[in-house]
């Protein structure tokens, strides 16, 4: 394994079951990412293909959650859309909501919550066209 320990949160019991099966040594919790109540900080926080399913206001509020759960000097990585907006996609034939703020607002939120942006790649071909943010807590 490339990590010492991992804690994962998802609101879907099915997704958590898949994680438990694949990585049985992980700490997997069914919870809402907006209020996970983990009561600990981590060296890295990743919200890959998850954060952008929250509406704009919830995304803004998430920066306090990210800050609460990131240890000093720790990293935060998440994916977003390439620009401000909302869209409805599909997953397994069901509609799936997506939203993103614009880059300037994300940068302001990072700064206001004590993070410095380390990298930002819009529609990264190496990541399947995802827009990726990486920041470090000051």
Tell where the protein language model's regions lie, with residue ranges.
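A conserved beta-strand element that flanks and buttresses the S-adenosyl-L-methionine
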Residues: 46-47
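Short, glycine-/aromatic-enriched active-site segment of Class I SAM-dependent methyltransferases
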Residues: 81-97
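Short alpha-helix
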Residues: 98-113
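Conserved beta-strand signature within the Rossmann-like core of class I S-adenosyl-L-methionine
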Residues: 73-80
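A short glycine-rich, Lys/Arg-flanked "PGG" loop and its adjoining helix->strand segment in the class I
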Residues: 60-72
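Class I SAM-dependent methyltransferase SAM/SAH-binding core
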Residues: 3-35
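Core SAM-dependent methyltransferase catalytic element
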Residues: 113-114, 122-138
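A short His-aromatic
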Residues: 53-54
């Amino acid at each position: 394994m490339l990590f010492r320990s991992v804690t994962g949160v998802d609101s879907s019991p099915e997704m958590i079951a898949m994680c438990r099966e694949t990585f049985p040594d992980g700490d997997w919790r069914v919870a809402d990412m907006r209020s996970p109540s983990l009561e600990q900080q981590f060296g890295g926080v990743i919200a890959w293909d998850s954060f952008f399913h929250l509406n704009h206001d919830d995304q803004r509020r998430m920066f306090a959650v990210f800050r609460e759960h990131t240890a000093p000097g720790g990293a935060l990585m998440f994916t977003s859309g390439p620009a401000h907006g909302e869209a409805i996609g599909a997953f397994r034939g069901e509609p799936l909501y997506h939203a993103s703020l614009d880059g300037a607002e994300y940068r302001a939120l990072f700064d206001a919550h004590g993070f410095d942006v380390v990298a930002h790649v819009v529609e990264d071909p190496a990541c399947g066209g995802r827009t990726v943010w990486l920041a470090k807590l000051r």
